[in-house]
Amino acid sequence: MGSMMPEGNTKGEKIILAYSGGLDTTAIIPWLKENFGYKVVCVCVDVGQEEELSDLPERAKLSGAEKLYIEHIQDEFCEEYVLPCIQANACYENKYLLGTSMARPAIAKRLVEIAKKEGASAICHGATGKGNDQIRFELGIKALAPELHILAPWRMTELWTFQSREDEMAYCKEKGIDLAFGSHENSYSRDRNLWHISHEGLELEDPETEPNYEHLLMLSVTPQKAPDQETPLSITWEKGVPVALNGKKMSLKEMIEELNHLGGKNGIGIVDIVENRVVGMKSRGVYETPGGTILLEAHKQLEELILDRQTMEMKKIVEEKFSQVVYEGKWFAPLREALQAFVKSTQEKVSGETKMKLYKGNIIKAGTSSPYSLYNASLASFTTGDLYDHKDAGGFITLFGLPELVRALQEKKA
């Protein structure tokens, strides 16, 4: 149905609120009750944001919520959303590893599931009208539950009249909500999950200004502050799935956590990017994705040994489109599923071991092995082998270059 004023009398109906416990979503609870008469069911979806969740039940209750769900979906997030992006080497505009983009559909799916369980008629989110998140949440909800209303308070300016955090805090106080909220002065706008942390705002809004990395970084150190010695590691893969780190079997969630630690202390995966948002504007952000950067580099390192040239060329095209579709919030679209099906078909023999060394922001290849390797040492050698004779190249060059030869002869005749 989309984001609009609910039709008819909504008093007593249930609405699902994507809830973090912060100021915005706290203020939304009494606002929904006052303006629409909704019973508010809060849902916090844990995708590894590392926030303190223990006080959320009390905060939601004091804010007037009927109920709170805290949904721990980190393993589901890894297996159903992160893994397809790893296998697709997903990267938007050559730098952004889609940390927020892949998390929003996972959250939207859980919001819809609880809406159906609770018999809710609507879902509400606190995303602003300028960013990509509103699109990702709403496209996911529309795809999974088109019958649900979607409320986006920041776009409902006739009713959501707050102009500042101070306005929101005054409103909460007026409604008897006496809770502490962290100050946003001198702080970045951040999004964190198991895969990454994004930073926006403050000096990053000026593209001429260097990021204040000392103040900004949370997962990582700068390459200049990384250790002076290399950190070696190996990753074992089975059909495009990373299954072991340094010989130790572990889940994808565990591996990402460990690689975030190893990569972070070596200054891996810090990018400063100006990206093109879906809504048309450019935005600047700094992203920390240490574990994800290592996994994607290792995966590409293994694929280049195993996949034939034409498959790699086609996969590159699919990867770019896959990344765009995910960035635009179309996770549940048939196109994303079709693109993923192609990617998955290429992973059948992507098994083996990738070795690398981490050093001051760099990932240095240290060897790759696979039982499905297409690398043939006797073919690649400069010496003549049984399968290849240097003389064979002459006929190939004649045929391969025939169009150029014909064109040159034609131009000479003219």
Model-derived features with residue positions:
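Nucleotide-activated chemistry modules centered on ATP-dependent adenylation/adenylyltransferase
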Residues: 2-18, 23-414
